[in-house]
Amino acid sequence: MTSTEDTPASKPETRRETLGYWGYRTAEWLAISLPERIGRRVFETLGRVAYRRLHGVRATVAGNQARVLGADPTDEHVDHATREAFELYARFWFDAFRIRTMPVEEFNQRLVMVDVENIDRALEAGKGVVCALPHMGNWDAAGHWFGANGYRIAAVAEELRPPRLYDLFLRHREELGMRIIGLTKDGHVGQQLKQLLSENWLVALVADRDLTGRGIEVEMFGETRRVPAGPALLSLSSGAPLVVCPVYTRDDGWEVRIGEPLEFERTGVMREDVAALSRLMAERFERAIAAKPTDWHMFQPAWPEAGSTAAVPATPAEPR
């Protein structure tokens, strides 16, 4: 039997956790309080400062960008792309908090939804849709659009410390119209997602980075890496189609491109089919990232040979 002292929620906050919480609270306040033009400049300036100061993270991002661009990490073009990646990631945070206060009419005008009929047709079967996304553009904006336009959408989020940081992002995304399922180790998450799919929900999973080390090996940009098996497994076990939905940052908004449901010839062996569908998903991710590499918010080593170069933590409570 586990005592309350052993549970993560019962442990006192560390100083670093407290600072992290207030850092995000401050970012939220700035994004909501400042005039948009000024706020965006402030966040992009912070992105440029991070680019100059966080040398280890910059090296990680440069390594990822170099792989995508097919260039040497020291190439001037890679350096420019790396700097832009920092600016766009800062823009991600500004937009993520800002859109919560934006009138729906204005928001709908600023988000371009391409080929949403692919999802509408898939929903006609009544089995829901699994939406797989790379860490691109602003997935909160995509989720908000669906929630604001009559779709029922759920996402999975990793539980965080301190608990009030998790609560902050839970509240934030629920206000955007998403239902958030906490990622736990009891195995119930998959059951909850299957139930939602059976009720014809959309389930959004940000799925271009494997956190377990046990994901599916795929080839992206000429090198092997891993992606989580979850989207493919959930799709195959529930009967819900799997679509890839990359999001791109535009000058004054965002663009979401809805792909067609992924199809392949099944073997009937679940393990092999999960691997095949995951590889197909990775191919679509590769195309999406290649279309705008600097909009890929990959601030951790994306390929094994990148080693243990310093990286920023995973996006707090990000949908998976």
What would you call each of these model-derived segments?
Residues 64, 140, 208:
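Acidic active-site catalytic centers that drive phospho-/nucleotidyl reactions
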Residues 2-16, 50, 71, 83, ...:
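Non-catalytic C-terminal accessory region of glycerolipid acyltransferases
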Residues 1-130, 137, 259, 274, ...:
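Membrane-proximal helical "anchor" segments flanking the first transmembrane region
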Residues 26, 38, 61, 142, ...:
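Hydrophobic alpha-helical segments typical of transmembrane helices
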Residues 82-83, 87-201:
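Conserved nucleotide-cofactor-binding alpha/beta core module
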Residues 18-21, 60, 141, 164, ...:
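Generic alpha-helical secondary structure signal
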Residues 59, 162-163, 224-228:
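Active-site metal-coordination segments of metallo-dependent hydrolases
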